[in-house]
Amino acid sequence: MLELLSKEVLQRRVFNPYYYDLHVKEFMLGQTKDHIDSEGTVLDIGAAVGQYSKFFAINSGHVYAYEAVPPVYEQLCKIKNDHLNFSAYNIAISDKVGKDKFYVDGQRLSNSSFQNLVDGFPIDVEVSTIDKQHENANNICFIKIDTEGTELDVLNGAKKTIDKHDPHLMIEIYPKFNKYPVDTTFKFCFDRGYTCFYNHRGRGLKPVKDIEHGVKIALTMPEITDGDFLFLNGNRA
């Protein structure tokens, strides 16, 4: 089925300097710089074509990026041309290890997921966990997760890594696609002592007081937050 994707669809998922600059200036991405260790490791889960990976590579010691859809992964690998501190993997990250069905958004390639969100077509993908992939890693300082509704599965497969490294987290929480109740991701992070912020476009970071407040922001302000939340770990300087 992948070979049937049109050139028009494939062209929609290429690195775009305009959108890169926009996300650095106005979205959560630009707010992450102060929370990335210049010598640390960043994990980009659901990396797409690498617009966030590029920013992380500029500001960290090394980036490990994961993208499940092969033609999107091919675009992601081009980041390596400019950033030697970058590694890409054609693996879907979740809470298990093995093989599974993954649904490709054949119209835009942007809403591909373990969930069939947009009448996609299935492909078989390799699946792993953050804990498995990075059990021997040093100084994982930041993890970004954008997996179209399965972010909690990624977190559940990263518990050992989170406990060991105390990374800051950037997580998409988009109720329309969430596999689980909206409060569950907030609870996972708040239970581990994280403080939470959203990016009010044009105004900067604003605090999320508690789980209930986070759910309200996620449900009512997606156009302002772009669905992204920043969770800061107080144990990391």
Language model features: what each stretch is:
Residues 1-237:
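Phosphate/nucleotide-binding beta-alpha loop and adjacent structural elements of enzyme active sites
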